[in-house]
């Protein structure tokens, strides 16, 4: 019994390792961490001036300009995929070995054996064929639309912003989690302080649900283990 468990347990652990759900890391890209932040310009207002240059100047866009400012991201992501593959292979092999099965070196023996072979007519013949035909097709159409407010985490030395934000909703026992991070240009931010997700570089968008409905749609772990180790 111990020997059986010794051989079975590695496959079980292998099956469990293959059932890990895909994850996404919201950690900033390496170049964002390596680049130094942009130095802030501390501008002092001129005494008696009507038009200051502080955080709330009279003439300026109401857009994110500093660290911790908010930017609203309009997520409009759609993906369409269509794949089709066909494969066919065949192989035929024929081997035919005629003549007698008995041979001799000397003349007298060879003549005698040739007479025996003439009556026996022993030979070998093999035929083999192999044919494989396979086809596959896949079609997917996905879309995801929502809005989320993000925060300017870092202003890079070239003026671009690294933004990050998250949102959690709990509705009827179902928890919805949305997370987003990426790099944007301040020039792509609209006058209403919004930006489309298509303008985000190195975008990472995570959407997942937690609750009874999510658990009911998942395969039991036992089924996942069997599918992972089943060789056929």
Curated annotation (Swiss-Prot):
Places the protein is found: Cell outer membrane; Bacterial flagellum basal body
Major localization class: membrane
PROSITE patterns reported for this sequence: PROKAR_LIPOPROTEIN (PS51257)
Lipid-linked residues (N-palmitoyl cysteine): 16
Positions where lipid (S-diacylglycerol cysteine) attaches: 16
Keywords recorded for this protein, A-Z: Bacterial flagellum, Cell outer membrane, Lipoprotein, Membrane, Palmitate, Signal
Protein's membrane topology: Lipid-anchor
Keyword Lipoprotein tagged: yes
GO biological process per UniProt: bacterial-type flagellum-dependent cell motility
Record InterPro entries: Flag_Lring (IPR000527)
Cellular component per GO, a single term: cell outer membrane
Protein function: Assembles around the rod to form the L-ring and probably protects the motor/basal body from shearing forces during rotation.
NCBIfam families: PRK00249.1-3
UniProt family annotation: Belongs to the FlgH family.
Subunit structure: The basal body constitutes a major portion of the flagellar organelle and consists of four rings (L,P,S, and M) mounted on a central rod.
HAMAP family: FlgH (MF_00415)
Protein name, per record: Flagellar L-ring protein
Organism: Campylobacter jejuni subsp. jejuni serotype O:23/36 (strain 81-176)
